[in-house]
Amino acid sequence: MQLPSFLDVYRGLISTSSISSSDPSWDQGNQAVIEKLSDWFAALGFDVDVTEVEPGKYNLLAQKGQGEGGLLLAGHSDTVPFDQGRWSFDPHQLTEKDNKFYGLGTADMKGFFAFIYEAAKRMDWKGQNKPLYVLATCDEETTMLGARHFSAHTPFKPDYCIIGEPTSLVPVRGHKGHVANVVRVTGKSGHSSDPSLGVNAIEIMHEVLFALMQLRDTLIKQYHNPGFAIPSPTLNLGHIHGGDSANRICGCCELHYDVRPLPGISLDGLDNLLRGALKEVEAKWPGRIEIVPLHEPIPGYECQHDHPFIHGIEELCGTPSQTVNYCTEAPFLQQLCPTLVLGPGSIDQAHQPDEFLAFDFIDPTIDVLSKAMRKYCF
């Protein structure tokens, strides 16, 4: 049987829609793309296991070789939604133009599996003494469901893991986490001509905002990591809405905010800080302040800076490792083994119209993956 080419696999990935979204009208399953990956890797001699994590949401684990340890190459099979009116190309068709591949998922990050496939296809597997694993997860773009499930249930522990998010082939050894909450203040509406008739939710929210800004200053003073370009946690007041008319006492006001904690800050500890910051306001206005998460929190992540794995991958890439501010599945896979983020394409193209991956990444990425397989599986 003739095996599909790198380009065949790349086209197949991009043409198979696998959008995940918190908006049910956009959210899709990823079964079709997982089935394609299953067929392709099985044809290369991998043992393939597909797990339905939730209805319509699947993880794939492909294994080549037996034994303990080995290398895990991981990525997510889903993409974000797209705005058709802002794309110059069909998002679900791989378009080649100006030495670039255009399409949804070319960089972030379904396309990475085509690189793994091609490197594995070219590899001479004689002498392999440790397994190679390929993990394709679901719902990274929303809840990190696939990575959370895999790290909690997998029966094995590889020696090392590489997640193929777009890093321009620069190894990433750490990133901040992400916590996003809603603060909902419930007041009591009434006619503005008599303030005593109601409780103004905007005025209570003013006190909430002051408390959160004080917390922001505390976080900056209390936590510092010089390995990050922005060395402290950030707290951003991102969205606020309250009231419906100038002549009504505001009955409800909502604030959306996020915090990006440094690695090492526990999510429980951060939650205690956030709730502690609002304790006095809540005591003053009992039953009127509610804190609700917008999504499950993601912890910060950092691979031990002097770990041999970092030095080994830096040597393969010829590039020093770095830290970044965006989030990946690394905090969850790091629970299993030392983990780095390394993949083709630029993060600047992620979640953007006309997402693309430059042809310049093709050969270097296949080369780095081939060398990593050889180094950690032989």
Swiss-Prot record:
EC number(s) recorded for this UniProt protein: 3.5.1.16
Active site: 78, 140
Pathway: Amino-acid biosynthesis; L-arginine biosynthesis; L-ornithine from N(2)-acetyl-L-ornithine (linear): step 1/1
Binding site for Zn(2+) 2: 108, 141, 351
Name this protein carries in UniProt: Acetylornithine deacetylase
GO biological processes: L-arginine biosynthetic process
Family: Belongs to the peptidase M20A family. ArgE subfamily.
Gene field: argE
Binding site for Zn(2+) 1: 76, 108, 165
Keyword Glycoprotein belongs to the record: no
Main function: Catalyzes the hydrolysis of the amide bond of N(2)-acetylated L-amino acids. Cleaves the acetyl group from N-acetyl-L-ornithine to form L-ornithine, an intermediate in L-arginine biosynthesis pathway, and a branchpoint in the synthesis of polyamines.
Classification via InterPro entries: AcOrn-deacetyl, ArgE/DapE_CS, Bact_exopeptidase_dim_dom, Peptidase_M20, Peptidase_M20_dimer, Peptidase_M20A
Subunit structure, as described in the record: Homodimer.
Taxonomic source organism: Vibrio vulnificus (strain CMCP6)
Reaction equations catalysed: N(2)-acetyl-L-ornithine + H2O = L-ornithine + acetate
A Pfam family matched in the record: Peptidase_M20
UniProt cofactor(s): Zn(2+); Co(2+); glutathione
Keywords annotated in UniProt: Amino-acid biosynthesis, Arginine biosynthesis, Cobalt, Cytoplasm, Hydrolase, Metal-binding, Zinc
Biological classification of the source: Bacteria, Pseudomonadati, Pseudomonadota, Gammaproteobacteria, Vibrionales
